[in-house]
Curated annotation (Swiss-Prot):
The gene is VPS10. Residues 692-711, 1527-1586 are annotated as: Disordered. It is a single-pass type I membrane protein. It comes from Candida albicans (strain WO-1) (Yeast). The keyword Thylakoid does not apply. It holds the Pfam family Sortilin-Vps10. This is Vacuolar protein sorting/targeting protein 10. GO terms for cellular component: cytosol; Golgi apparatus; membrane. Residues 1-21 form the signal peptide. BNR repeats lie at residues 450-460, 496-507, 792-801, 846-856, 1136-1146, 1177-1187. InterPro entries: Sortilin_C, Sortilin_N, VPS10, VPS10-sortilin, WD40/YVTN_repeat-like_dom_sf.
Amino acid sequence: MRNNWNWLIFLVPFILSLTTAYTPDISVVKNKSPAREIKYFDDSSNLLVLRDEHLLISKNDGKSFEEIPDIKDPIIYFEMDPTNKNRAFAMTLSQKQYITEDQGNKWRTFEIDIFNGEMASIPKITFNFENPNYLMISNYECPEGQRLNRNCKHRYFFTKDGFKSKPNKLPVDAHVCRFAKSTKTSKIGKSETIFCTVNQLNSYGHIVESHLYNSNDFFQNKNEIKIKPLDSSSGEIIDVKIEEDFMIVVSRMDKFNEKSLINAYVSRDGENFVRADLDIDIKYGVMSFLPSSVSSLFLTIMDFNSRAFQTASFYGSDSSGLHFTKLLDNVAGGNIQKIENIDGAWIANIGVDSNNPYDGDESLLDNLFGGTYAKSIVSKVSINDGKDWSLIKLNDNSCKIEDECSLHLWDFTELDGEGKFVTGPTPGILLGVGNKGKNLAHEFEKMKTYVSRDGGVTWNKALDFPAVFAFGDQGNVILAVPYNGKKKYEAAKHFYFSLDQGKSWEKVDLEHPIYPLSILTTIDGTSRKFIIGGIDDSRRAENEYIYSVDFTNAFDGKTCGDDDFEEFVARKSNDNGNDEPLCVYGHREKFRRRKQDAKCFVNKLFEDIKVIEDPCQCTEHDFECGPGFRLSEKESTNVCVPDRKQLTQLCQSKSEITLPNKVLVEGNKCNMGDKKLEDFVSQETLKCSDYVDNGGDGNGDEKNPNQGDSNQIEVHINDFEGKLSQYQYIAESKDNNAADNVVIKTMDDRLWISNNGGVSFVRVPISDKILGFYAGPIPGQITLITATNIIYVSDDGGATFIKRKVPTQPSPRVDRAIAFHSKNVERFIWFGEECESNGRCTSNAYITDDAGATFNKLMANVRTCDYVGAVLESGDHELIYCSGQNSLDNNNNNNKNKNKLALFSLKESSSEEPKKIFENIVGYAITGTYVVVATIDDKTDSLLSKVTVDGDIFADADFPHDLKVEPHQAFTVLDSSSKAVFMHVTTNEKPNFEYGQLLKSNSNGTYFVLTLDNVNRNTVGYVDFDKIDGLEGTIIANVVANAQANEGTKNLQTLISHNDGSEWDKLVPPTIDSEGIKYPCTGQSLNKCALHLHGFTERADYRDTFSSGSATGFLIGVGNVGEFLTPMDDPSTATFLSTDGGVTWKEIKKGVYMWEYGDQGTILVLVNAVENTDVLYYSLDEGQTWKEYKFSEYKVNIYDLATVPTDTARKFIIFAENPKDHRDIQTFTIDFTNIYPRQCQLNLDDPEHDDYEYWSPTHPIGGDKCIFGHESKYLRRAKGHTDCFIGSAPLSEGYKLEKNCSCTRRDYECDYNYVRDVNDNTCKLVKGMTSADRKTTMCSKENAFQYFESTGYRKIPLSTCKGGQQFDNWNPKPCPGKEKQFNEYYGREVKGHKLFFLIFIPLIIFLATVLFVYDRGIRRNGGFKRLGQIRLNDDDDDFNPIENDQIDVVVNKIVKGGVYTVAVLIATVKTIRKIDRMMLEKLGNVIFRRSPGRRNYVSVPNDLDEEEELFGDYQDNLDDELEDAVFNQDDNLVRTPFADDVEEEEEEREGEGEGEQSNPSDERLFDIDDNEDEDEQHEVNKPTTS
């Protein structure tokens, strides 16, 4: 029995050992604040922690931390040296920095002059992998008070001895510097080779030149590297990268646009660079290089078009690094990761269209990816370097890929000891957080933790919750801490660990629950010690706890033997039952790893995992296309075809060339076996003439350097189902060059969007029927309208849409469904229809200030509403106007005005009822900063116009006296960009014979004058009126020449005005046509033979205009030369071009063509608008020469030709009918981006030596350059510089106002109620009106108290002229009986306190002053009797006044001055009396030559001495006095001195010389009559002799 108990005692410890789980050793350290950074030294137990600017060290894997006694200064950051595992750097904000070379045990200082001013960036250290003692340290130094910008200087310092001596400044002002040996595998240059880019800036901050240099002696000497076609004056080098053994130079194509496309130039030797064929719109800041190999470069291109859902494209290159292939699109958030240690293995999250992407609450994933907005996320894996992707297989019978179920991972990385996120340094063991299903779940709490043991090909569930994790001992120890996300705010109370590669897990309690911030172990993942860092669950403080977890004693520390290991072969897909591993780079990879259930550890601390490589048999996949070849887009197999772009360069000066079509991928390790190289590669001989563009016209002509290389033009074709219904460019930002988003709606209610200028389109995944879309005034704003009460709102140019529910369906009674706020994207007004049970419907307005999340009813029975306060320069910014039913009470059926349209005003944030402004209106229009309201006067039954500039006070907009506008007459507000409102009033409404008067207002929009009569309009109210963009005051209009006929066919003629409608002329026709044949216009007047253009009313797309705002002075139009405009289909119709603002024209093509401008006019494109075609014509030299380009393999019917509204892009879209199905459309995107080899050089500091020249518009009459009173100079690309593009060059900064000119007739237009007489170019009163009528009209207005006596002219608001001829003389006069109001208005009425201040205050001051002077200066000094002693000679007088202080001195001087003044006046009077009165009268007659009843003139005498004595030197001011001459007016006529008047004056002066012998140079006539004289103007009398 005793023996049994002995056995029992012996078994108890054994049983307990079986039932009690292993617990690792745990220690914890508490801190008052969380660590900013925590990193391990490589192959060490030492780690550094930065907390509150204190650097701490742990020498025992985080069990305890201690201060570093050698460091006395605050530390802003620290960095481990990747080239030396024992070295680290700690940086301060002083000149003293710290370095350790023994893994943190001891630190020393070094000094560097890097903080001599404001620090704009944290210093960055550049390392050298070949010589670790070669280092560079740099930061940006900015001018005081400025943030990081181009004015900041990047300063580099270098050391050759690892900072043992003080670093020296690199003697170059570099933008970026890199060591050639910046990677372990780099074969470029020497250990001391440095590459630097240097930007030369001008005084405007523009980059003038950008250079790339290298140096082998730290820039004591330097060598410039020339990269063709990258010229130093073209583009901007923005970065230099060393990736593996590739060197990449990244340049911005447009150095003036930070969002410009970029190019990458690749080299393997650092000397010879070739441009990579990244045929994508890469923008700086969104290109990221991923872990690459010697055989390929990998990178992602992030697309930031969507603010809610950011995606990236994944690219891989061939072994040359030059030819890239898109491997994956729509990578969600750029989340793609290379699996460590396994070549060719990648995991990525991909955004896919969701069946219901807009429903559901926002979650953590939504914040990270934007999941609720547009996309669902699925995870995929590739094991052949991205060539093929597959869903991730889960070893779960309830989730099979064939059932649309797979694993989707939110995260599959750990934080390594260096602070980087990696999949883990394990032999194929991975952990990830995600869920099974069709896509990644939005709710974080639904996710679980999964494990893979085959490199990510298949997975198993590990934990029922999401966790952060880390690997130890090559994956044999896994530590995981639960992480519940932001929604479920709960701290982790436990951690879990697995000792069998994730098969089973044990739970361990944490002494202090934490929110985990980091879990890490040694960099190589071989240690069994971990650190868990996190903050506690206290809401009041952020205490940090750092746990040290040690698994060293697990399995009693046993080290594995050979039997405990297995061979793991990577990249086994098991697809189709095939268990063979996939070969990548010509080899298989094997690993020796511990068996899953082995009870031991590898226990090889700080020893990296070893990969066993096994070569494969060579196949087609081990070869790539050779130089001059590219992969075929048509063939699915690995077929290489000649590449025209590459051959253009390779064929220089050659007639034929022989090249291998394929080459073995560099770094590939495949084994030929029984194969030969010829089995995979063939030599091909190519004729260069088949691939090199001769640049001619297609008929064998010699190359024209002005036409570029058409091989650089790219065409992208897209097919759409349904006919074209609507399209529009949407700008992404305020940058004019950023409007790359194109939205297309088809007739079948589908929507397509492109964010690359039309290169590719994506269908918007919305199942609702889309009626249309509206683009708002704010960049990126677009709203989709559906047939239901659902709308979709986007503020990122259509990259993503938010689903919103509106109160009602859109109202068919309102001509638009939505009214946008011009400044706030969150605000808009919705117009919906609400119907009652009896079928009666009303149109209501609803307002939102949260982008449609909520709505409030604004007003019922509306016609339209607008945010007018947002566009007016003054007034209430919350003001809203609505036009609607006069009575707001639907039940008030007795109101006779109920059906009339009224104008109401409301406030956005006010709950007050709408305020009625006008009872009876036709409508209102917003133009510029004016609001014009058309009201009906019920008394006179006439149409009146009211104008406001502040939304509160309305002024009458008075039409000319002879124009009465009936209520039924249409008027159209056309423009207000020139500080005046242009309006067209229809005067003839006969169908198909409509025309009217073009009126122009004064600067405040109150008085309108007739500027052009019989202006053509069409049936729907559009007018042939075009304001020319970019040129002040240039207008083109068509008039009906046979207006009196009133029936039949209109005879249209085209007129142009260069002074904002004041004067009009016909277009001067070209002398010859495009074929060199003369036009029969010689000897004919412009009335009989001129150029006429088809105008606004005949355009299929009203957005197509003659001009471009960016191509200053360029105009293109379709028309003919003759007496009248002929129909479009007339044989005489042709296309014409002007490059000088419409002064001269040339015919460029016979027939009707569509046109577009590109790159601010350096690219002109024409395409046939009538006939089916497969070609377009383009010009790169301002229309001097044209080249044909075939864009399609078949002829198509073209609907439209388009580009960005600013005409600054180099991409054009042709919308055409699909020839395969006439019900569908095609787009051809023609990309000229690469047709220019360089960007034009702009240097405003030295404009004579760049690619631009100044151009000034010239007035066609007189030929001078004074337009609107000033001479302007605009920058344009210089003639002959046709090899460069403009891009975003700020040409406006080079605009010059050369001078202000003297005023001439061209600076004036006719005043209110005056009209220009085309016969003598004078302004006359309108028919039936006199000056008295004008006074009566103006004074009859309500509250009027003044009127103006007009000369008949008023200065054009745009004119800035000075001096010269003054035609306007506005003289305000009081209306009868309104003198008191008039005087009060002008401050002339003196009464009350004003009278007291003007009279009594000065009188009191004067009397007080006199009394004071008398008392101190006269009475005290003896009174007036002593004043007689004061003589003019101060030395002889006997007056010695009392002067006790400075006041006495001043007073006595005043007394003396007064005495002297009185004495001089008395002496002067006495002298004049002595002059003979007869002589004085004679002198007066000679001077004034008076003649009774005649005008009075001043004759300048010949005696210069007398002249100077009487008048001074008159010659200096002669021109000014002549310009001051004024003129009179008749009741109906105002004459002005034009050129013919000057001739008459010269003739009269000749007559004067015959009658009198006088010096003509000294004799001048000055008319000094006032304006009331009614004698005939400019009457000149010969002076009479006295």
